[in-house]
């Protein structure tokens, strides 16, 4: 039976892989079980790790540190890469508001930490450790321990406080989301609603009655007009055609125009009259039945050399006589303007004759199978850049110790930046949704298994000490009170959708486990987008605050 002992107990690379895989498998298996209608999902991996550590399982400390760090990096980088394309646009759609609400969660928790330390007599280093556990923020704990070492103060006690408060930190945010959902959220609030966005693409029909544009080309009219638009079809004398930019408009021409909804009124003035007898934005319109000579087909951009190119530079309309009416990217419908920068995976709705569309298909690629091949080069380059960013020390006035973004902050910021701007420098950042979810789940499982295993050895001894229950109660308060209060204000008073509120609360508490629960129980991507919108700022602030509290109150 020596082989069995070596497999599970003798420290080695093989033993570390076996133990962490076993913990992850048990935790993920339990995560499928629903208790009172609620499943904690991947969070059970953390508790399986605590039990394994309590019963004596351990792995080599260096292997544990590597697996924990690598798992966290994979998770946050993949998350940033996924939400990157919509990250900066989210600031125009409430991102600033979400960050202000997340900031309120951070500051309220910090205030409660100071008050609780003075009210209960718990030392500030212990209280900072409890705060780090309550906010599931191990980078902040590392920063706090480093600060204590530089101040010549014992640095091990915050780790115990963090370990004791951490489980409640994981569950507390989920409980806060559950409480808000139970008492405030109605069934219709969980339905995916189309956002009221004036910039979304809109299809409208116009008839040319403005003498100012009679006998002028579409190109000249577009230069006269500030609102951007695309003329998809032109009806003249009973004949339907796809107009090129040189097409001259005449009185009485009927136009099918794609633009932003906010521009409809201005274009009505430009063309002369809007036809409102047909709703062209309904999803059940048979576009191919509108004109028998033309067909509509969706083509996917799969040729790598097109990544980062402007749509207008391809001159598809002039060369092939087709029209691109809409572009879909990551579930978002974009206006097909000449300035639009193409990304691998974009889905273009092309209208034209069958032969012309076949030619366009060759230009764009439309080889969907090629998109399933993972672009691992970008993954590893991004991880290196993210870790480099996280290692850069930032000097802040009044604080002697430089502050770093760390393992979590650097990679998610680089992931967001590459997801947003990568195609502009012809870097292929496209990853299928299933591949991205696999990376995130793998990274999070590794991270939680290591975290639980590390905390499990002394967890129950600390919990059952006289001050253990007090620490648990304080940690629960630091987790639940700020999230419930801010969540109530965000959802009930500010009328922010429940998915975004949940993601904001998870991001403000740096809690990927709660985010996983939110993603599993709330339709749509709003939780992930909101999480990534507030996570970088909150992570940075948590790391700074952990150091500032100790320096100013103990210095």
From Swiss-Prot:
InterPro entries: AAE_transporter, RCK_C, RCK_C_sf, YidE_YbjL
Keywords: Cell membrane, Membrane, Repeat, Transmembrane, Transmembrane helix, Transport
Repeat is among the record's keywords: yes
Protein name in the entry: Uncharacterized transporter BT_1229
Superkingdom classification of source: Bacteria
Compartments where located: Cell membrane
Family: Belongs to the AAE transporter (TC 2.A.81) family.
């Amino acid at each position: 039976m020596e082989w069995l002992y070596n497999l599970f107990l003798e420290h080695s690379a093989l033993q570390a892989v076996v133990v962490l895989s076993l913990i992850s498998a048990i935790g993920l298996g339990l995560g499928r079980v629903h208790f009172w209608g609620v499943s904690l999902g991947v969070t059970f991996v953390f508790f399986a790790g605590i039990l394994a550590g309590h019963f004596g399982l351990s792995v080599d400390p260096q292997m544990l540190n590597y697996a924990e760090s690598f798992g966290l990096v994979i998770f946050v980088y993949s998350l940033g890469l996924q939400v990157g394309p919509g990250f900066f646009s989210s600031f125009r759609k409430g991102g600033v508001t979400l960050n202000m609400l997340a900031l309120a969660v951070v500051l309220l928790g910090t205030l409660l930490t100071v008050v609780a330390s003075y009210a209960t007599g718990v030392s500030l280093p212990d209280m900072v450790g409890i705060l780090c556990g309550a906010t599931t923020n191990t980078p902040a704990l590392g920063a706090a321990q480093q600060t204590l070492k530089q101040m010549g103060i014992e640095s091990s006690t915050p780790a115990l406080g963090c370990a004791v408060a951490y489980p409640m930190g994981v569950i507390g945010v989920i409980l806060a989301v559950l409480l808000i959902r139970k008492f405030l959220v109605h069934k219709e609030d969980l339905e995916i609603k189309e956002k009221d966005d004036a910039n979304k693409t809109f299809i409208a029909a116009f008839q040319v009655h403005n003498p100012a544009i009679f006998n002028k080309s579409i190109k000249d009219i577009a230069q006269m007009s500030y609102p951007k638009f695309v003329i998809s079809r032109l009806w003249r004398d009973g004949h339907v055609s796809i107009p090129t930019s040189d097409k001259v408009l005449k009185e009485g021409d009927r136009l099918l125009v794609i633009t932003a909804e906010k521009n409809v009124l201005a274009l009505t003035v430009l063309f002369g009259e809007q036809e409102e007898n047909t709703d062209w934005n309904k999803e059940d319109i048979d576009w191919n039945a509108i004109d028998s000579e033309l067909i509509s087909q969706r083509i996917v951009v799969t040729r790598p050399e097109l990544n980062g190119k402007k749509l207008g530079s391809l001159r598809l309309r002039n060369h092939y006589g087709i029209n691109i009416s809409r572009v879909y990217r990551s579930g978002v419908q974009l206006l097909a303007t000449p300035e639009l920068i193409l990304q691998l995976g974009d889905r273009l709705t092309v209208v034209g004759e069958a032969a012309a569309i076949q030619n366009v298909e060759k230009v764009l690629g439309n080889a969907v199978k090629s998109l399933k091949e993972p672009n691992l080069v970008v993954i590893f380059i991004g991880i290196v850049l993210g870790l480099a960013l996280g290692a850069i020390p930032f000097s802040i006035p009044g604080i002697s110790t430089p502050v770093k973004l760390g393992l979590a902050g650097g990679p998610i910021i680089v992931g967001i930046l590459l997801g947003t701007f990568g195609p502009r420098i012809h870097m292929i950042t496209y990853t299928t949704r299933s591949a991205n979810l696999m990376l995130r789940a793998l990274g999070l499982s590794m991270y939680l298994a290591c975290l639980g295993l590390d905390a499990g050895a002394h967890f129950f001894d600390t919990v059952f000490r006289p001050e253990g229950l007090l620490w648990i109660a304080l940690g629960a308060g630091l987790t639940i009170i700020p999230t419930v209060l801010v969540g109530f204000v965000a959802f009930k008073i500010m009328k922010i959708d429940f998915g975004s509120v949940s993601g904001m609360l998870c991001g403000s508490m740096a809690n990927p486990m709660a985010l996983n629960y939110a993603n599993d129980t709330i339709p749509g991507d709003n939780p992930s987008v909101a999480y990534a919108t507030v996570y970088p700022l909150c992570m940075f602030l948590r790391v700074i605050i952990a150091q500032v509290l100790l320096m100013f109150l103990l210095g």
